């Protein structure tokens, strides 16, 4: 297979359009899957995607169009360029136009993609096998998977962009069932290379929660002080970010639209001193410091490829500070260019402690395991609905006293920001609903007052 760098050079040198950007992504992934406390499959996946974006002058304006293919060879280059140019001409003048970056170099351009493989599980797999043995002896069934992905992205252009980033990430998701499958719980862990994954901690969490489910407590629908683990916080606020584009807010189409026009930037949304930001230099979750966009969307623009990504405060001290911008939308809204970064971090000033510490602070409430099947109900308030899954626990006097029924919940993350009673320490966490979409998230566990359960 031709190297990504050589392919980009071939395409950009052959391009006859005004400018041309090529985005190549090489991805390898190793995985393990198990069911009934028995390993069922393992494998390695290798993928490449090549996106060619043509920029063409049309009637005094600039148009863009792109095509994406896999397994591109040198012989495919002319047809690929023709298709991208045709797509640009058909699209007409781009409403997200901004001057293209030129002559920007970031990262080790010439280095090869470093593939992952089964060796990444060298420490994890034996520990997992031991957990299987213990679970069989104790009549606990384990289901789940682990995967490790390394993706390398190269962005090159006629105008001199030579950008490269590497994104290694792994995760474990595991469900434990016992007592003829009448009890079920879940645990999820994010990792960079599996050297820091504690199977013992996963085992202990699953066993503790299955034990809690030995006592049943029936509770009615209503509003409860609710402890959300950091992963559930990540699920809620991922959805909030997905509706946080400045253009939609400016045009009156989102929860962040201001009555009478404009956006709610500058409005205090949280009752506590809460920080919510993206930062490529955040030590625990380093991320790319440049924009790489294969397609234009409300969240990004192909015209912004190569633009720098710096720290962006979405909420600062509980005040809405920024919304997601392309350079074109920033000009339209007369606000700063604040591109969406590759990580999201939430922290609460002065907060510390674990999920267990938060339980001790709740007199009468609920402890959730995960949120599931999250859907929008009302975009104007960002009212969401969803289900609880794999364990809801009744907390009384600072202790878990038993498991209760699952609920359908109905609440808004924007509203929840104003009802935070307690917060734990920020930790790298795994959302459950959006685990396949978001991996670089650090969140605290939160206690939300009056969380609506139906």
Region locations from a protein language model:
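Active-site bordering "gate/hinge" segments
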Residues: 1-301, 307, 316-317, 397, ...
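Dual-mode signal for accessory low-complexity, basic/Gly-rich regions
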Residues: 261-454
């Amino acid at each position: 297979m031709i190297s990504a760098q050589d392919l980009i050079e071939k395409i950009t040198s052959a391009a006859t359009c005004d400018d041309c950007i090529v985005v190549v992504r090489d991805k390898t992934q190793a995985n393990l899957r198990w069911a009934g406390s028995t390993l069922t499959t393992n494998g390695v996946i290798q993928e490449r995607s090549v996106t060619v974006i043509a920029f063409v002058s049309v009637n005094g304006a600039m148009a863009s169009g792109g095509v994406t293919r896999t397994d591109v060879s040198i012989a495919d280059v002319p047809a690929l360029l023709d298709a991208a140019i045709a797509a640009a001409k058909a699209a007409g003048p781009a409403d997200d136009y901004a001057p293209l970056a030129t002559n920007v170099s970031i990262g080790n351009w010439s280095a090869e993609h470093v593939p992952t493989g089964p060796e990444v599980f060298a420490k994890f797999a034996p520990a997992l096998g031991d957990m299987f043995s213990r679970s069989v002896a104790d009549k606990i069934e384990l289901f789940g998977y682990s995967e490790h992905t390394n993706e390398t992205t190269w962005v090159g252009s006629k105008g001199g962009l030579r950008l490269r980033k590497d994104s290694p990430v792994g995760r474990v998701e595991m469900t434990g069932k016992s007592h003829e499958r009448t009890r079920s719980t879940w645990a999820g862990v994010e990792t960079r290379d599996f050297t820091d994954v504690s199977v013992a901690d996963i085992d202990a969490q699953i066993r503790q929660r299955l034990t809690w489910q030995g006592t049943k407590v029936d509770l009615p629908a209503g509003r409860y002080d609710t402890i959300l683990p950091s992963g559930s916080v990540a699920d809620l606020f991922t959805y909030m970010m997905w509706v946080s584009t400045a253009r939609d807010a400016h045009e009156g189409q989102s929860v962040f639209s201001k009555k009478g026009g404009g956006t709610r930037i500058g409005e205090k949304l949280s009752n506590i001193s809460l920080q919510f930001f993206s930062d490529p230099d955040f030590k625990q979750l380093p991320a790319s410091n440049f924009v790489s966009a294969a397609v234009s969307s409300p969240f990004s623009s192909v015209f912004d490829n190569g633009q720098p990504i710096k720290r962006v405060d979405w909420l600062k001290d509980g005040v809405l500070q920024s919304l997601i911008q392309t350079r074109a939308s920033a000009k339209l809204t007369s606000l700063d260019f604040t591109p969406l970064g590759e990580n999201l971090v939430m922290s609460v000033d002065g907060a510390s402690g674990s999920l267990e510490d938060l339980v001790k602070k709740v007199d009468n409430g609920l402890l959730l395991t995960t949120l599931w099947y999250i859907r929008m109900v009302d975009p104007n308030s960002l009212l969401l609905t969803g289900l609880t899954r794999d364990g809801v626990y009744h907390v009384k006097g600072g202790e878990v006293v038993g498991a209760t029924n699952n609920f359908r919940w109905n609440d808004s993350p924007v509203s929840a920001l104003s009802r935070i009673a307690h917060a734990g320490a920020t930790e790298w966490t795994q959302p459950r609903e959006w685990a396949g979409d978001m991996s670089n998230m650090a969140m605290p566990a939160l206690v939300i007052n009056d969380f609506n359960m139906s």
